[in-house]
Amino acid sequence: MPRVKRGVTARARHKKVLKLAKGYYGARSRTYRVAKQAVTKAGQYAYRDRRQKKRQFRQLWIARINAASRQNGLSYSRFINGLKKASIEIDRKILADIAVFDKVVFTTLVEKAKEALAK
């Protein structure tokens, strides 16, 4: 069986890692060993933060809805409960947009939630 020299595959793998590390500071973008660690860690951060991004946006939406509903005299939890009782199914992303950009419509939603809670 002939000897297999691994220069081609090793170079390809090194090039791939160094390409991913392009733009990193110092040896992280030039040295394979350090670049490999940096790329691996960057991948871990990216994986984690793709999940955290969803949580952070939901927190932001809830904070905006809470602020707007309190201006209309209702806490966030009571507002959401009122919407559910009034059979109004709008997700938090849309509610937050309405709260920021269309205060008249949001006030109407708060009034409907108050009516549903009073029943």
Swiss-Prot record:
GO terms for cellular component: ribonucleoprotein complex; ribosome. One of its GO terms (biological process) is translation. Keywords: Ribonucleoprotein, Ribosomal protein, RNA-binding, rRNA-binding. Gene3D superfamilies: 6.10.160.10, Ribosomal protein L20 (1.10.1900.20). It holds the Pfam family Ribosomal_L20. SUPFAM superfamilies: Ribosomal protein L20. One of its GO terms (molecular function) is structural constituent of ribosome. InterPro entries: Ribosomal_bL20 (IPR005813), RIBOSOMAL_L20_CS (IPR049946), Ribosomal_protein_bL20_C (IPR035566). Belongs to the bacterial ribosomal protein bL20 family. Binds directly to 23S ribosomal RNA and is necessary for the in vitro assembly process of the 50S ribosomal subunit. It is not involved in the protein synthesizing functions of that subunit. This is Large ribosomal subunit protein bL20. It comes from Shewanella sediminis (strain HAW-EB3). The gene is rplT.
